[in-house]
Amino acid sequence: MKFTNLTAKEFGAFTDSMPYSHFTQTVGHYELKLAEGYETHLVGIKNNNNEVIAACLLTAVPVMKVFKYFYSNRGPVIDYENQELVHFFFNELSKYVKKHRCLYLHIDPYLPYQYLNHDGEITGNASNDWFFDKMSNLGFEHTGFHKGFDPVLQIRYHSVLDLKDKTADDIIKNMDGLRKRNTKKVKKNGVKVRYLSEEELPIFRSFMEDTSESKAFADRDDKFYYNRLKYYKDRVLVPLAYINFDEYIKELNEERDILNKDLNKALKDIEKRPENKKAHNKRDNLQQQLDANEQKIEEGKRLQEEHGNELPISAGFFFINPFEVVYYAGGTSNAFRHFAGSYAVQWEMINYALNHGIDRYNFYGVSGKFTEDAEDTGVVKFKKGYNAEIIEYVGDFIKPINKPVYAAYTALKKVKDRIF
């Protein structure tokens, strides 16, 4: 085995072939970081047949003028079951970054620690406890099992839906009642989905602004999304849910005809048997449905006059690789939330994964707090409704490479933090 630099082609071919390969360990992310002006390294291990068996994208940032901070975002991509390989990689990586004036090395591997349900109850262990001892022996310090959303650290909890050996019908069957109803609702009510181009990205951004204002969370800036759409190319998809009013109103008219037919039948049943309570209840229920149907038709015609035949209602931002589809961000028009456009977006992308043989649909980050007063309690309930599971990752590890200078650096940082 040998530790070596990799070409982008070698790196991409390997990371695309591996499980637990995060979108930040892809050629698209490498090209993005180069364009942003970061010092970037592609490194890995090759076996005696010159085949890549481990790979890692590293970025380096200047620290204290003469040193650098090296970071591998969700790297390396490696067979973590091969502990000998893991040891060799991190040992050689430390030597490599030392040659490049590294002050300290930071990693947050895409490696599960344990599994939980959406109530926060542990359902299983990922059998990676050994990794903590291994990293400690190699000189890495674990930063702790942090929870919540941090502007610097990667989120440690993901909500993930397993699609392996499942059909679309299986997914719907396993949803809770609300998710089933809304998924069927958008399939029925003329809600369509198409993918936005780079020129149309402002539509998505407007929805994100609506959502961030209503839910009081900090969104990324425009540059973040535009750059990833540009450099990730077909590894980013931005689905837009919209109402096609011609189809929507047509379907509502067809529904009205059926309801009127059923109502007339119920009225005839009452004429024949006035004492039949079931017929009276059925009449009342059908009349309520008809009233609601009429309101929807009136609303649809009004909105069609105001907005034209197509009305954008929701959009999402997704990262794609052979391992998983990642729901990174999404927003919905507050004025048209009742059309349940976000469910159309989710259903479109779940089916995208199924149709492309991708076994994992990642709803992405949750805080890991699982309490009613947690900042993301509504989001957790939404993801829980799809019958997803929670994966908790091992977290962050830091290795001081130049120990004396790193000690001085951390001491100065603590003083600065106290002052400011």
Curated annotation (Swiss-Prot):
What EC number(s) has UniProt assigned to this enzyme? Answer: 2.3.2.17
Report the top EC class in one word. Answer: transferase
On the tree of life, the source organism's domain of life is Bacteria
| Reactions catalysed, as given in the entry | beta-D-GlcNAc-(1->4)-Mur2Ac(oyl-L-Ala-D-isoglutaminyl-L-Lys-(N(6)-Gly)-D-Ala-D-Ala)-di-trans,octa-cis-undecaprenyl diphosphate + 2 glycyl-tRNA(Gly) = MurNAc-L-Ala-D-isoglutaminyl-L-Lys-(N(6)-tri-Gly)-D-Ala-D-Ala-diphospho-di-trans,octa-cis-undecaprenyl-GlcNAc + 2 tRNA(Gly) + 2 H(+)
Q: Which InterPro entries does the UniProt entry name for this protein?
A: Acyl_CoA_acyltransferase, FEMABX, PG_Glycine_Bridge_Synth, tRNA-bd_arm
Gene3D superfamilies in the record: 1.20.58.90, 3.40.630.30
Entry's Gene Ontology cellular component terms: cytoplasm
* Keywords for this protein: Acyltransferase, Cell shape, Cell wall biogenesis/degradation, Cytoplasm, Peptidoglycan synthesis, Transferase
GO biological process annotation, one example: regulation of cell shape
Task: Please give the chief subcellular localization of this protein.
Answer: cytoplasm
Query: Which Pfam families does the record match to this protein?
Result: FemAB
The UniProt GO MF terms for this protein read:
aminoacyltransferase activity; nucleotide binding
Q: Which SUPFAM superfamilies match?
A: Acyl-CoA N-acyltransferases (Nat), tRNA-binding arm
Localization of this protein: Cytoplasm
Purpose of the protein? Catalyzes the formation of the pentaglycine interpeptide bridge, which is characteristic of the S.aureus peptidoglycan. Adds glycines 2 and 3 of the pentaglycine bridge, using glycyl-tRNA(Gly) as donor.
Subunit structure of this chain's protein = Homodimer. Interacts with FemB.
Give the family, as the similarity comment puts it.
Belongs to the FemABX family.
Q: State the protein's name.
A: Aminoacyltransferase FemA
**Which organism does this record belong to?**
Staphylococcus aureus (strain bovine RF122 / ET3-1)
